[in-house]
Amino acid sequence: MNQERLMQVLLAPQISEKATYVADKYEQVIFRVASDATKPEIKAAVELLFKVEVEGVQVANVKGKVKRFKGATGRRKGWKKAYVSLKPGQEINFVEGGNA
């Protein structure tokens, strides 16, 4: 896999109450990823950027919500979410910027 492509796969960490719960209970980290990203690309990108070992990757396509603004109906953009399972003993800490 091209290293340039791997840098474009991960868009942002998904930081929310649910993401924190999943991280504590299941040792998983949630990322927003490119819509055309595959599981092997996501795994390689996380291992390259954060220097951790990945056990598995699950993905989910999130549909955009229908919203109204001043009477006009529009739709938010859909996106892809990746649940990355880390091997035991591995950790990614976004607050301190890097792995712990």
Swiss-Prot record:
Gene Ontology cellular-component terms listed: ribonucleoprotein complex; ribosome
Keyword rRNA-binding belongs to the record = yes
Which GO MF terms does the UniProt record name? rRNA binding; structural constituent of ribosome
Q: Show the Pfam families listed in the entry.
A: Ribosomal_L23
Which InterPro entries did the record assign?
Answer: Nucleotide-bd_a/b_plait_sf (IPR012677), Ribosomal_uL23-like (IPR013025), Ribosomal_uL23/eL15/eS24_sf (IPR012678)
The processes (GO biological process) annotated in the record are: translation
> What keywords is this UniProt entry annotated with?
Ribonucleoprotein, Ribosomal protein, RNA-binding, rRNA-binding
Q: Which SUPFAM superfamilies match?
A: Ribosomal proteins S24e, L23 and L15e
Q: Does the keyword NADP apply?
A: no
Q: Which family does it belong to?
A: Belongs to the universal ribosomal protein uL23 family.
Q: Which PANTHER family match?
A: 60S RIBOSOMAL PROTEIN L23A (PTHR11620)
**Which HAMAP family does the record associate with it?**
Ribosomal_uL23_B
Return the protein name: Large ribosomal subunit protein uL23
| Annotated organism of origin | Dechloromonas aromatica (strain RCB)
